[in-house]
């Protein structure tokens, strides 16, 4: 697909999904145009009932804890990821790079803990490389 769409005047909602970008594009076409610029409103992918996800660089992944307490967010990879944790409004709570933990031999993985509130949304995002991200309610370093 070449990325071009020819539209007659009207209002359109297009869904975009691909490597590194997902979201909904809303655009109003009022006359014949040669170019159209639309913002992509990124949405988050839910962890659902799982405690791990393969996280692509730049994507948001939403986690909603079932109980209040300390949660541990960490990567297991062969790459060099950096982890970001955001609150329900996507305000940055913390970012971590190169933090060792017992579940990986890669010293470039990340590991962070945060006191989360039950029922609230938390967003995880990675940069550097796509990785497996895990969320646990017990310290993975204490599990061994």
Task: Outline where the language-model segments fall.
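Acidic, Ser/Thr/Pro-rich low-complexity intrinsically disordered segments
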Residues: 1-24, 54-139
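Predominantly extracellular/luminal regions of secreted and cell-surface proteins
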Residues: 28-49, 141-144
């Amino acid at each position: 697909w070449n990325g071009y769409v020819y539209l007659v005047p009207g209002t359109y909602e297009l869904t975009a999904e691909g490597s590194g970008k997902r979201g909904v594009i809303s655009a109003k076409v009022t006359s014949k145009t040669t170019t159209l610029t639309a913002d992509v409103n990124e949405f988050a992918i839910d962890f659902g009932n799982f405690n791990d996800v393969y996280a692509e660089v730049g994507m948001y992944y939403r986690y909603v804890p079932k109980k209040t307490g300390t949660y541990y967010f960490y990567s297991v990879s062969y790459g060099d990821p950096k982890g970001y944790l955001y609150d329900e409004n996507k305000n940055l709570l913390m970012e971590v790079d190169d933090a060792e933990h017992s579940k990986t031999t890669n010293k470039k993985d990340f590991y962070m803990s945060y006191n989360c509130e039950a029922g609230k949304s938390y967003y995880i995002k990675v940069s550097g490389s796509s990785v497996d991200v895990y969320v646990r309610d017990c310290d993975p370093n204490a599990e061994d």
